[in-house]
């Protein structure tokens, strides 16, 4: 008889405060900005090209309610249900009949930004530093996962999982003082993970899986109320220098980029049961490289080229 198991709803806080940092991701059109943050969710956009998304603080590894109850401790060595496929493909060989597991993780992030922003025209500071703070910039999310495993014969087992390993969404209001650094940021991924396990003997199993990942992302910066007011205030000075500044509309995008890509990787594992009471496991998930391609757009007029400043996303 086939055994079907549906895991309970997972509820976890996935994102916590991050170290001081911020990233510029567009040419700083008018001024050199100095912007310090004590916390910033948007740094996770660097995971798009990172060799280890799981180290970026936005991992989604709640594939099992059982594992969540242990804070994922020893997850690769605890084949309680089919979701073990995500952490150790070798361990799917433990099951003597087909199993299906499904989970839903509710991610309730609590990310607050607290800092200030200052402006300069050339090397000359303009005005006093202004606050750039906002609460609860990251959205809640429901993240599903599905897993199926089944023995093929006495030696071989196979399975497949559909889940995500990382993702985020953040959004700032028009009142955020540093909206020209960060406005909307969203990363969505889904991974298809077929896997096989081979039983070397009664105690030892080895497993291998393929990771086929689709990712899409959107990042952008916008015109804040503060920036629009600052540019308007600089207009007379710029006019005296022979420079005409455009009128900025709060809420319009300075820079918006969206794209998608497919990436491929692999995972492998070893599962050893030296005794009935002891499990030993070793697992590894290789990097999946993603190079997103898409479109870039802006709702804001371009500033004079001599006032542009370089920007980058690391």
What is each residue range found by the language model?
Residues 4-9, 18-23, 40:
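Short, often N-terminal, low-complexity regions
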Residues 5, 24-28, 61, 71-73:
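Long, low-complexity, polar and repeat-rich extracellular regions
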Residues 14-30:
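Short, Lys/Arg-enriched N-terminal segments with co-localized hydrophobic residues
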Residues 31-54:
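Gram-negative bacterial Sec-dependent N-terminal signal peptides
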Residues 56-71, 120-133, 140-314:
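Outer-membrane beta-barrel porins/channels
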Residues 58-74, 93-112:
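Transmembrane beta-strand segments of Gram-negative outer membrane beta-barrel proteins
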Residues 75-79, 85-96, 148-154, 167:
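Outer-membrane beta-barrel pore proteins
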Residues 97, 114-121:
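Glycine-rich loop at the start of a catalytic domain that most often binds anionic cofactors/ligands
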């Amino acid at each position: 008889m086939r055994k079907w198991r549906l895991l309970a709803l997972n509820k976890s806080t996935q994102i916590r405060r991050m170290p001081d940092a911020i990233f510029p991701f567009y040419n700083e059109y008018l001024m050199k900005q100095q912007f310090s943050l004590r916390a910033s969710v948007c740094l996770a956009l660097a995971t798009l090209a990172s060799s280890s998304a799981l180290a970026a603080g936005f991992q989604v590894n709640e594939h099992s309610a059982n594992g969540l109850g242990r804070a994922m401790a020893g997850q690769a060595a605890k084949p309680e249900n089919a979701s073990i496929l995500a952490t150790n493909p070798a361990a799917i060989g433990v099951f003597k009949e087909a199993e299906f597991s499904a989970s839903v993780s509710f991610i309730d992030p609590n990310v607050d930004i607290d800092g200030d922003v200052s402006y300069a025209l050339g090397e000359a500071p303009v005005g006093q530093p202004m606050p750039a703070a906002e609460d609860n910039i990251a959205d809640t999310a429901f993240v599903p996962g599905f897993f199926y495993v089944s023995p093929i014969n006495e030696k071989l087992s196979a399975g497949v999982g559909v889940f995500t390993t990382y993702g985020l969404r953040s959004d700032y209001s028009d009142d955020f003082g540093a909206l020209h650094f960060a406005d909307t940021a969203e990363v969505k991924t889904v991974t298809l993970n077929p896997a096989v396990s081979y039983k070397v003997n009664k105690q030892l199993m080895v497993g291998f899986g393929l990771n086929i990942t689709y990712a899409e992302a959107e990042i952008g910066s916008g015109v804040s109320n503060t920036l629009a007011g600052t540019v308007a205030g600089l207009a007379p000075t710029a006019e005296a220098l022979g420079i005409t500044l455009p009128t900025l509309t709060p809420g319009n995008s300075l820079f918006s980029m969206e794209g998608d890509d497919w990436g491929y990787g692999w995972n492998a594992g070893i599962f050893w049961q030296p005794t009935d009471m002891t499990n030993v496991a070793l697992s590894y998930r290789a990097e999946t490289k993603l190079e997103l391609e898409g479109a870039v757009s802006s709702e804001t007029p371009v500033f004079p080229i001599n006032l542009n400043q370089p920007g980058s996303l690391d």
